[in-house]
């Protein structure tokens, strides 16, 4: 369940279990005590009326009942002096002496621990769910580990409303794309901010060459975390919830709370998750027709080859082991964990390995007035040959387009020893043919790309409770990593990528991030009013450095060392670096009245180093909100457990990219010289400004049903783009600002949870609808040299797709994902395709709208059934709307290896109007034309399936709990018209390359098992 199980739901579950057990015991007791005559009855109540399902027992006996729907109970067989014990989850247990009275009403007081659900919100502070004026969704850590993924964010797909998550197509450990409430910025970041235990984390990515030709997609910072260390995750989808975190939170926040030690006991947990991956969604290809002599394309006669590209792929394995220790006393609690993640990919000689070591200690001293909380993590990661898509460093072009008449076993022997050269050379008699074709086995074994990363994190917080209503806290976090990226391209690799003796690239990058803040908190109550307020300041400092070398090998083939690089021709030293710092002050306040009205407000002022040379050195933003608990304002019926309405308004600023307000001098590795920037600095740039409001309703009914719905709308102003400058200015362009991008939508979650005896059932459905629209794009821009307006286009071209004639083009009235094509088959005045037997088909040059890569609706449905330790869980997910495009399908048609092209040949050709044209002639014309390779992205699938059994603890003398289970992921694609998995992302770092397939690695179906032991 996304929402924390409510107190009322827990009470209902306990009531049903108690009713079944206690009434059986009461019946048995009655047979044994027929001679007893003492009888008492009454009603159990709380401040709101009768309490249903409370356990009423005679202390020290099995004589007991549960209260009925009116809170009534009746006990017999009592003796004077017996003690009646009344208990139910959420209330303080009450004991009352029996003195012979026939009537005894008992009033219960709610337990302070269960007065209200609490969720973790901004700054890591737990707040009453009733008080929140914005939407927050919380998931427990157990929901992330049921079906483990090397990147735990992929486990959230379909389980959180308002969040779109795309898995990277490069397999386990790859970065994920997380977008909340739509894409807001033309040039800025759209990714959510990650916050660990209240402290922001810099979510760096170690990918390179991020484009539709990407060769090494890499991972990101959040993928390094061990999901077993996570206690809970809160998703703050709106700016009102995230306003205190600064400009990085403009696109929402993922709040991660990690585990602590446990007071009073020692718990050791050991877990293993092993899964196996097979290629799932893959293009349909043919092996019936072969290639004519001297041709690569398979447009020849029937050969009925047994070639099957699927045989190239391995069965991938993903093994995750974890051991943790939680222990503690009242004064000191400790948590330690070790985790290993070892993955072999579906591509030969590819994999991902990660090793996590974590510890956390919480100590109280000075009469429990001071709390010191310290944590540390060390992570080692090694990934090899991660491949996403594109023509470069990708085995799939050669694999898919391989001529069907030829012998694949010759290709499997990918290198042959050349006695004249003295080393082995590649065997691939076809060349790259302009589409990056290489021997797939050579790519995986002799074009080796590897990342090795070491990362350590340290955090500490010191809290001093000055009084019972005032405390101060200071926090610091250090997050550093070193990453080494190497490319080893062996001699005879295609000359596009390597020199005659091979090529070598060796780059080391370092990132050092330090965050610190100080916060004072007031929590005071005056009669019916209460105040919770925070005021503080923070500093966030990030330094990045990269140094490396890239070039062809000179003297010794296949000797990969810096001193063997060709220093005269193709030697390219590489060095980059930047230093960002932000400073801020912030405040928040929550005023409550009688636990039914909550007024909240926040304010933050930022000073950003990126703005240092502009005329606007800082920027401020705020939020206000109101929450009204209607069910607490009147005597609500018993079936209505909670009814809350809420609303909020927020503004959040977001800084633009560095180096836009100052001339800088980049180094040109080709000419070994410095050059001035081609971009004129604009000192009048302002931060992006997102203004958002939302209204929502939260309700809980009949102790089992919860319903949450939110409507939101946001507008993001000060969009940054580039305006062209005349050549006489000495610059090419300058940054300018304008625009207004609107997102509006609905987030909805509906859940039900109940139990009957040994059987339990829970279900949760989430739905997100988002509309993205560019309300305003470009204003006039003034030439800073002449003072005259610069003529601007009424559109911005943001992304082109290699292999297809399509671009993402932004226009007023359109969306941030609109795709346009440029060629269609010529048609006559009657709408028929024009075909001249002598000239063939022809194309018409015209810009036309293909659709948007942004989905309209995301949904998910998760259900759990439990019985006597057996748990069955299923998750269905779906997306409606949007388009995807496939350059892969275009290439398959061009080379005659698609099943579609074989079917056309079987049918005698392609039917055009009333005639038939040869299939090869038809596909030759439409190859590369996006209009014919665009597909609906709508899809529905059985995303996850879990079946587990918790063995009875008595089997282990009550000293151990053991759970074993079966897990599956991507088990059934219920509906999908696209020829590849439309939810995979070949490039998670850009909005403008979503929904595009260029020899993308296929998605996988994963099946495995898990074991968990707890001592």
Short names for language-model regions:
Residues 674-675, 738-743, 787-825, 902-907, ...:
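C-terminal beta-signal and terminal closure region of outer-membrane beta-barrel proteins
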């Amino acid at each position: 369940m996304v929402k924390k199980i409510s107190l009322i739901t827990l009470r209902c579950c306990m009531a049903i279990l108690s009713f079944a057990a206690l009434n059986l015991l009461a019946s048995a007791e009655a047979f044994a005590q027929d001679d007893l005559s003492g009888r008492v009855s009454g009603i159990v109540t709380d401040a709101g009326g009768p309490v249903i399902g409370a356990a009423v027992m005679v202390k020290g006996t099995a004589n007991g009942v549960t209260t009925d729907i009116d809170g009534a109970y009746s006990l017999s067989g009592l003796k004077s002096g017996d003690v009646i014990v009344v208990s139910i989850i959420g209330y303080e247990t009450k004991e009352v002496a029996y003195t012979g009275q026939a009537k005894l009403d008992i009033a219960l007081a709610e337990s302070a621990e269960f007065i209200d659900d609490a969720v973790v919100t901004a700054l890591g502070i737990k707040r009453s769910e009733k008080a929140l004026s914005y939407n927050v969704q919380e998931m427990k850590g157990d929901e992330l580990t049921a079906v483990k993924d090397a990147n735990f964010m992929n486990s959230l797909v379909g389980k959180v409303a308002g969040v779109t998550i795309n898995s990277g197509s490069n397999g386990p450990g790859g970065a994920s794309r997380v977008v909340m409430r739509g894409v807001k910025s033309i040039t800025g970041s759209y990714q959510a901010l990650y916050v660990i235990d209240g402290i922001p984390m810099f979510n760096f990515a170690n990918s390179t060459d991020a484009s539709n030709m990407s060769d090494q997609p890499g991972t990101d910072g959040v993928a390094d975390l061990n999901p077993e260390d996570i206690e809970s995750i809160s998703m703050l989808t709106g700016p009102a919830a995230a306003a205190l975190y600064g400009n990085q939170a403009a696109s929402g926040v993922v709040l991660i709370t990690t585990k602590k030690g446990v007071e009073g006991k020692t718990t050791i947990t050991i877990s293993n998750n092993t899964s196996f991956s097979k290629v799932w969604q893959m293009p349909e290809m043919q092996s019936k027709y072969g290639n004519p002599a001297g041709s690569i394309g398979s447009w020849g006669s029937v050969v009925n080859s047994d070639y099957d590209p699927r045989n190239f792929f391995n069965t991938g394995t993903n093994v995750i082991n974890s051991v943790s220790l939680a222990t503690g006393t009242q004064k000191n609690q400790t948590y330690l964990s070790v985790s290993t993640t070892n993955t072999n990919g579906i591509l030969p000689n590819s994999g991902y390995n990660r090793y996590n070591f974590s510890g956390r200690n919480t100590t109280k001293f000075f009469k429990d007035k001071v709390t010191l909380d310290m944590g540390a993590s060390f992570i080692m990661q090694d990934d090899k040959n991660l491949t996403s898509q594109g023509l470069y460093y990708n085995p799939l072009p050669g694999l898919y387009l391989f001529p069907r008449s030829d012998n694949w076993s010759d290709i499997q022997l990918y290198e042959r020893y050349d006695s004249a050269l003295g080393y082995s050379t590649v065997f691939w008699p076809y060349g790259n043919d302009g589409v990056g074709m290489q021997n797939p086995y050579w790519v995986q074994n002799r074009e080796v790309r590897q990342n090795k990363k070491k990362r350590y994190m340290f955090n500490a917080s010191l809290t001093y409770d000055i009084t019972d209503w005032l405390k101060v806290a200071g926090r610091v976090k250090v997050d550093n990593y070193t990453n080494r990226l190497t490319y080893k391209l062996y001699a005879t690799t295609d000359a596009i990528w390597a020199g005659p003796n091979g090529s070598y690239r060796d780059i080391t990058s370092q990132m050092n991030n330090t965050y610190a803040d100080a916060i004072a908190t007031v929590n005071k109550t005056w009669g019916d009013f209460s105040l919770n307020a925070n005021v503080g300041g923070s500093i966030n400092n990030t330094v990045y450095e990269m140094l490396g070398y890239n070039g062809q090998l000179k003297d010794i083939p296949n000797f990969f060392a810096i001193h063997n690089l060709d220093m005269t021709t193709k030697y390219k030293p590489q060095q980059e670096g930047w230093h960002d710092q932000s400073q801020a002050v912030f405040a928040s306040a929550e005023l409550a009245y009688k636990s039914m009205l909550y007024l909240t407000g926040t304010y933050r002022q930022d000073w950003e180093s990126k703005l240092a040379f502009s005329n606007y050195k800082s920027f401020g933003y705020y939020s206000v909100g109101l929450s009204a608990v209607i069910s607490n304002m009147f005597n609500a019926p018993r079936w209505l457990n909670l009814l809350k309405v809420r609303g909020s308004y927020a503004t959040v600023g977001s800084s633009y990219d560095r180096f836009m307000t100052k001339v800088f001098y980049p180094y040109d590795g080709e000419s070994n010289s410095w050059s001035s920037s081609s971009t004129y600095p604009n000192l009048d740039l302002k931060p992006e400004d997102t203004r958002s409001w939302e209204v929502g309703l939260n309700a809980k009914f009949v102790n089992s049903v919860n319903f949450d719905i939110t409507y939101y709308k946001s507008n993001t102003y000060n969009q940054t783009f580039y305006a062209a400058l005349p050549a006489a200015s000495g610059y090419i362009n300058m940054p300018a600002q304008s625009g207004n991008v609107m997102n509006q939508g609905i987030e909805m979650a509906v859940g039900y949870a109940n139990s009957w005896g040994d059987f339990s059932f829970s279900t949760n459905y989430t739905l997100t609808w988002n509309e993205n629209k560019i309300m305003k794009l470009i204003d006039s821009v003034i030439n800073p040299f002449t003072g005259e307006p610069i003529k601007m286009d009424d559109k911005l071209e943001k992304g082109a797709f290699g292999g297809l004639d399509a671009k993402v083009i932004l226009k007023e009235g359109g969306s941030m994902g609109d795709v346009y094509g440029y060629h269609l088959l010529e048609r006559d005045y009657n709408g028929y395709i024009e075909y001249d037997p002598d000239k063939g088909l022809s194309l018409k040059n015209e810009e036309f709208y293909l659709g948007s890569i942004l989905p309209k609706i995301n949904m998910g449905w998760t259900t759990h059934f439990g019985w006597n330790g057996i748990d069955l869980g299923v998750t269905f997910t779906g997306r409606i709307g949007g388009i995807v495009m496939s350059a892969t399908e275009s290439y398959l048609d061009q080379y005659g290896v698609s099943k579609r092209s074989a079917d056309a040949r079987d049918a005698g050709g392609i039917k055009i109007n009333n005639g038939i044209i040869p299939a090869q002639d038809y596909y030759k014309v439409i190859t590369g034309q996006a209009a014919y390779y665009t597909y609906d992205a709508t899809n529905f699938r059985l995303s996850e399936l879990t079946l587990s059994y918790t063995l009875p603890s008595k089997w282990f003398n009550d000293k151990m709990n053991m759970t074993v289970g079966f897990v599956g992921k991507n088990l059934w694609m219920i509906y999908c018209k696209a020829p590849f998995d439309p939810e995979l992302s070949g490039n998670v770092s850009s909005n403008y390359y979503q929904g595009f397939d260029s020899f993308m690695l296929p998605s996988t179906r994963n099946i495995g098992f898990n074991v968990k032991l707890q001592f």
